[in-house]
Amino acid sequence: MAAPLLHTRLPGDAAASSSAVKTLGASRTGISNMRALENDFFSSPPRKTVRFGGTVTEVLLKYKKGETNDFELLKNQLLDPDIKDDQIISWLLEFRSSVMYLTKDFEQLISIILRLPWLKSQTVVEEYLAFLANLVSAQTVFLRPCLGMIASHFVPPRVIIKEGDVDVSDSDDEDDNLPANFDTCHRALQIIARYVPSTPWFLMPILVEKFPFVRKSERTLECYVHNLLRISVYFPTLRHEILELIIEKLLKLDVNASRQDIEDAEETATQTCGGTDSTEGLFNMDEDEETEHETKAGPERLDQMVHPVAECLDILMSLVLSYMKDVCYVDGQVDNGKTKDLYRDLINIFDKLLLSTHASCHVQFFMFYLCSFKLGFAEAFLEHLWKKLQDPSNPAIIRQAAGNYIGSFLARAKFIPLITVRSCLDLLVNWLHIYLNNQDSGTKAFCDVALHGPFYSACQAVFYTFVFRHKQLLSGNLKEGLRYLQSLNFEWIVMSQLNPLKICLPSVVNFFAAITNKYQLVFCYTIIERNNRQMLPVIRSTAGGDSVQTCTNPLDTFFPFDPCVLKRSKKFIDPIYQVWEDMSAEELQEFKKPMRKEIVEDEDDDFLKGEVPQNDTVIGITPSSFDAHFRSPSSSVGSPPVLYMQPSPL
């Protein structure tokens, strides 16, 4: 029986759909009626058999004998751009009765038939589907061309206007029948699969090959991805490969649209065009017409991204997130079995593509969103990352990335309860203590990222999580909360010879120092000052001569769940996302007190003064400055040459 098709979001619709996986609607022939109709076509005799002095069969047999005149006439008739529906139907009926003669010798003829404009009247569609079924069942050599033809219809047709040899217009055809045409193509795939069970195996390479170039229009990419996701529903064996293909393409977009570039584009557009697309108005001479257009499309335009790559990425990301919800939710409730299956697919893709990708900003949010469906999946994700981090057989870059993900996930996932946060902190801190114990008598017990990268990454995950969650950890019974934090023994970590305060991102270190200082958990400022004095400048050659720089990110820090700035995707993420909580006026005053010029060597005195050292590496501790300085650095010193590090041309 044909599987149901997916309706996540109709390409071109303004609003993102939250519909579940639905069966074929009344707009299409029902499954049982479809089969009955197919059987009628398969058994019906040709209505017209005479062409050019004989049947198609006779023409084909003559061609094999070397008589090509009738064959050439046949091809010319099929290539007629003004061919009528009745003519198409008549030819298809004859070809069905001659399908046994359509061997590989007639590959050119089949290619012409596959280019016929068959997505027209319902009668033409039904006859064409019957022909495809007969052809692939009798001549499997033509299975790939048939599948390729169908896949080529998963994007809007192009409208090309020429003046001489020059294309003056090349755009998507806004055909109202496009959704129905997509439905028909999916139906065609299912019919073919019924006669050739190996269809999915042959289909996947074709879907990869037909994936539009990422510089194609957003609508073209949206339609193709939409149709790939629908295929994954009725060909579930292809789901993993389809999702991997989509996410791989999203990554190529993501690494070419940094968060900073996106925000800069939005800010520039707001300043210059009052928040509208900066390209609009350049060719609109009629102000009244422009105003009317804006009024009609106002809600849609509010979701548009100014940055063109971000706009495409946002559309596709929201489509994937909507698909995930459609798959996992049944009647408004999470289906554990379906969600578990999807989690297995996505965690494998995450390991293969995301964990080794340094420059992605948004694609990884598919894991964030999936984990929000049920706590068990969030805990499974954390356990998976933990195993990656503490496994010495993994490359250091993978272990460090796992640490980055743990810290960012614990800090930003609003759906993770405090008990899970505490359990993860216990696990991380205990591992750090064991690591330090093992270094005490070793020859490598000194500060070096190359030697202890995973250790520093775990330290930063702890510091980062603590900064975000300290209010929750101390809420309720303050004395009990302090007792718990004291049991973590931050002092041993901070005072160790490995000196994590020197390696971790300065913004993280300074917030950690300020908060632990306030609650007398550990006193960091003397170490910070000593580290600052020991920080050696690095001389780098530039186009304008040598320049002196200080490496402020030796750990190559990356916070994968920094705030999402894609407008459509944010609607999925914001309800489950932990933003930085504003500090009270009293806290601000305490944290912002300037330190005296003299370096305070006594940490007890430093704590009593409640001061934060003011130097080049310390940021202002205000709610407005937090997210800006606490994000992944826009560029990192010593970044490893991992996948997608260098933006590739789209």
From Swiss-Prot:
It comes from the Eukaryota. Keywords: Nucleus, Phosphoprotein, Transcription, Transcription regulation. Residues 630-650 are annotated as: Disordered. The modification Phosphoserine is found at residues 169, 171, 639. GO terms for molecular function: RNA polymerase I core binding; RNA polymerase I general transcription initiation factor activity. GO terms for cellular component: nucleolus. Residues 632-642 have a biased composition (Low complexity). Required for efficient transcription initiation by RNA polymerase I (Pol I). Required for the formation of the competent pre-initiation complex (PIC). This is RNA polymerase I-specific transcription initiation factor RRN3. The gene is RRN3.
